[in-house]
UniProtKB/Swiss-Prot annotation:
Pfam families, per the entry: TiaS_FLD, TiaS_TCKD, Zn_ribbon_TiaS
GO cellular component, one term: cytoplasm
UniProt record, GO biological process: tRNA wobble cytosine modification
Catalytic activities: cytidine(34) in tRNA(Ile2) + agmatine + ATP + H2O = 2-agmatinylcytidine(34) in tRNA(Ile2) + AMP + 2 phosphate + 2 H(+)
Protein location: Cytoplasm
InterPro entries xref list: TiaS-like_TCKD, TiaS_FLD, tRNA_Ile2__agm2C_synt, Zn_ribbon_TiaS
Native species: Thermoplasma volcanium (strain ATCC 51530 / DSM 4299 / JCM 9571 / NBRC 15438 / GSS1)
Protein name as it appears in the record: tRNA(Ile2) 2-agmatinylcytidine synthetase TiaS
């Protein structure tokens, strides 16, 4: 059977994943595979923080088992295979946890729980990445597929819960999270940076640290029970990385849990659309048609044209040094942008410069007799300051471009959960499902 839940946190506290940690401590069924953390449309206006739903496949484990984590000193195992066992009581175990831990006083927190004997059709997952789904639409979908749901307040969380059960897990990464309830001890920034750099030394991990911007990315909001989270391609490597961070940092923790995720998979990206729609995320190859311009706040914009028509690509202030490259684009450049289209702009998450145009500057001609640079005396009137000879045609010199074809990521501090950094792209090509050989 499958259980999923969503929308239990708020901007000021809690983390939906912590309810999974508590659920796994209480449930009497085995975990088949890994618990799942599924990120959905990053543009949805109702999201409380990271727009991630949780799900888990439950049953009676068979055969080889693997370590998922450690729950208050007890090792938690998962199984590659299992016999299905449907126990509707897990819905009410989860209900108690939602009532105990959710940020129900926050106006935009509207939890939802879903259970099902079978996974849902994957088309619903892709819809939840691409557009805004109504609560009534989610109710109908879950009911039509023989699932059951439980709503708190408006119950908007059933939308993400249904999508988490629909996720086909065709491209995957992992994240290991360490917890301390109600929140971890305060860790100074210098120590966070040191431990984030340490995590970054482990094979296949990513988005751990941004040294240039002094951002220790593995450490989230200290108001939640999450101490740190390390993302990567190999669960056994993540377990070793977490142990090293805990030991070297002398970190007091309650539990660790490894999740199978769709983070850094680009699942939200629609490839080369014919039409651009609001709240969707795209990969768009376009030609630059104007020079970039900036506005107050350090945001940069550039007009571009693709087969879907004209649009404005944007690099906002949080993308930091990425804006320097973005600002050097010129008319005629061909660029593939990746990003989300909101409020009339494509908010760029990364870009690949395919080709750069040749740029020429207009200069006064050299005197053929004196080899001296002439001076402009008016429109198409150039005179040699030495001999006085006149010329009516300017010279043009090619300007060396400050950028070149290549792949450009925004810095770690600005990366979104679903966006795949170019640095791990080759790993997906050789190991599509990010599973250990």
């Amino acid at each position: 059977m499958f259980l999923a839940f969503d929308d239990t946190d708020s901007p000021s506290g809690m983390c939906t994943t912590y309810l999974m940690e508590e659920f796994l401590r209480k449930v009497n069924l085995d975990v088949i595979g890994y618990p799942r953390l599924v990120r959905l449309n990053p543009n949805i206006r109702y999201k409380t923080r990271g727009n991630g739903a949780l799900s888990v496949h439950l049953g009676r484990g068979i055969g080889k088992k693997h370590t998922i984590g450690e729950l208050h000193g007890k090792i938690l195992y998962g199984y590659a295979e299992g016999e299905d066992e449907y126990d509707e009581n897990v819905l009410y175990v989860m209900k108690d946890l939602v009532e105990k831990y959710s940020e129900l006083d926050y106006f935009n927190t509207n939890p939802g729980i879903v259970v099902s004997k079978n996974p849902f059709p994957e088309n619903y997952y892709w819809s939840a990445l691409e557009r805004e789904i109504r609560i009534e639409e989610a109710e109908n979908f879950i009911t039509e597929n023989n699932g059951k749901f439980l709503k708190f307040k408006s119950g908007r969380g059933i939308i993400g819960s249904g999508a988490a059960i629909s996720w086909p897990a065709t491209r995957t990464t992992y994240e290991i999270l360490a917890y301390k309830y109600p929140h971890p001890e305060e860790i100074e920034t210098e120590k966070k940076m040191r431990l984030s750099i340490l995590a970054d030394t482990f094979r296949g991990t990513f988005n751990n640290v941004d040294i240039a911007n002094k951002y220790p990315a593995i450490f989230p909001n200290p108001k939640t029970p999450v101490i740190f989270g390390i993302r990567g391609l190999y669960p056994s490597v993540l377990a070793n990385a977490a142990k090293k961070v805990i030991d070297d940092g002398s970190i007091n923790y309650d539990s660790t849990v490894t999740y199978l995720t769709n983070q850094a998979t680009d699942d939200h990206i629609i490839d080369e659309p014919n039409v651009i729609e609001d709240l969707h995320s795209y990969k768009i190859t376009a030609e630059i048609i104007d020079k970039p311009f900036s506005v107050a706040g350090g945001h940069y914009f550039v007009r571009s044209i693709s087969r879907a028509g004209e649009f404005t690509a944007a690099a906002f202030e949080p993308t930091k040094e990425f804006r320097h490259t973005f600002s050097k684009l010129m008319p005629g450049d061909t660029v593939t942008f990746y990003g989300s289209f909101t409020n009339g702009n494509l908010n760029v998450e990364k870009m690949q410069i395919i080709s750069v145009s040749r740029v020429f500057s207009r200069v006064t001609p050299l005197c053929k007799f004196c080899n001296t640079r002439t001076k402009s005396k008016g429109k198409n009137d150039f005179r040699c300051p030495k001999c006085g000879r006149r010329y009516n045609t300017p010279d043009y010199h090619e300007v060396k471009r400050e950028i070149s074809p290549g792949k450009y990521d925004v810095p770690v501090v600005a990366r979104r959960h679903l966006s795949m950094p170019f640095e791990i792209e080759s790993m997906f090509k050789t190991k599509i499902n990010a599973l250990e050989a």
